[in-house]
Amino acid sequence: MWLKVRRFVKKRSLIFTLIGSSFLFSGVTAHAEEVTESFTLDPMVITATRTEMSVKESPSAVEIVSSKKLEETQAKTLRDALKSALGVNVFNDFQGRSNVSIRGSESRHVLIMVDGKRLGGELSYNSANAWDVDRIRMEDVERVEIIRGPAGALYGSDAMAGVINVITKTPEKNAGSINYEYGWYENGKGAGYKSNVYLQGVEKNVSYKLNAGLNNNRPYMDPAGSGDEMNFYGKEQPISLSVGYKFDNGNQLSADFSRIKEDNQKGSSSVTVMRPGEVWQNKKSTIYNDNKRTDYSLTYKGDDEKQSWIIRAYQSVYDKRYTSQDVTQMFTGGKPGTITVKDPKIDTVKRTLSVIEGHDSWHMGDKHYLTAGLEYRRDNSEGTRLKKKGTPVAGGSAYNAYDEAAINYTAVYVQD
């Protein structure tokens, strides 16, 4: 065990890391006349063609953020990992919403995936799933593949500007890690903590990995003294589990499950003077932003010298509940008076992505590598953002009426 102390410009962090691994040693005999040659292998990329090929052979502009780079830069989230990427800009707009841009594009034209799988996210026309730059953590990540430029032929219109594909680790040995981080804001106040446990193992033909965390951040108060909370704060609980089986012929079957749960809030205050020195009111507004996403997948794949193929079914379910609540209290002569609690405004979203896909890649001669595949995707959304205003829902009056809509996508593609 060792202790690391890291300093940042905006906050200080104290980090404990405990790593355990199993190692296999074998005897080595050295000879004076033996000559050792070293080779640097060209990095491999999957996202550009949906099958593994070298970066040099890729038809797209590709950048890989390797595990070594992630470690050197101490990247904790996908936002951190993308800071050094060429042509990629991650920023927050005036409403605090995350945005991702590739070569100046809008966020809705950048597709973010994990292991080639889409993620259910906000029903937001502008930001799409850009919020995931802060949700996706790097403890279980092998590399991040970035495609700069249109990839609509393989991934659809939401990849018009490019693709960011997070590739997670494949268990190769028994290992694990425990991480804990506590941070402080510039003003010396506690910013909260982040904790994570990662385990992986291999037993004969079976492999597994478990990644679980608990994060709790605290509010950053307005330095001007208004009493406003400048950030959303609260708890975040991510967990993922993957189990795989490798058959004797080399084919692999894997099942994956992941869930992230967020309970966040943010408050602001305002004072309205009715009669100076005599009557005024204090208004406290609180926003509750609670999110949960659950992902399931089942994958069967295989490869040999001639071809590589995969068949996969997966589902991503995103639940959101956004509530705003106003509480007003009157003061007369400095004495507290009537408290008025308004009905909360509630916005709810449930989005379900269901996908069945498969593709096969094979060599045709010495110069051609053909990939052919198909994808069926159903994007079903329900909530308060789909109809006219005014219809009440449980707990208060919604911004919009509750309704449901679905879009079905079917794609067939061939690429050389």
Predicted regions, residues:
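N-terminal Sec signal peptide and the immediately downstream disordered periplasmic leader
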Residues: 2-73, 80-85, 200, 237, ...
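Hydrophobic, lipid-facing positions within transmembrane beta-strands of outer-membrane proteins
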Residues: 42, 98, 162, 176, ...
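Outer-membrane beta-barrel pore domains and translocons
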Residues: 49, 149, 179-185, 213-217, ...
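N-terminal periplasmic accessory domains that precede
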Residues: 78-81, 98-101, 112-113, 131-134, ...
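Extracytoplasmic beta-strand/coil segments of soluble accessory domains associated
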Residues: 79-118
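Short acidic/polar hinge/loop motifs at secondary-structure boundaries
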Residues: 101, 118-148
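Periplasmic-side early beta-strands and strand-to-turn transitions of outer-membrane beta-barrels
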Residues: 173-187, 194-288
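Face-selective signature of the C-terminal outer-membrane beta-barrel domain
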Residues: 246-260, 287-416
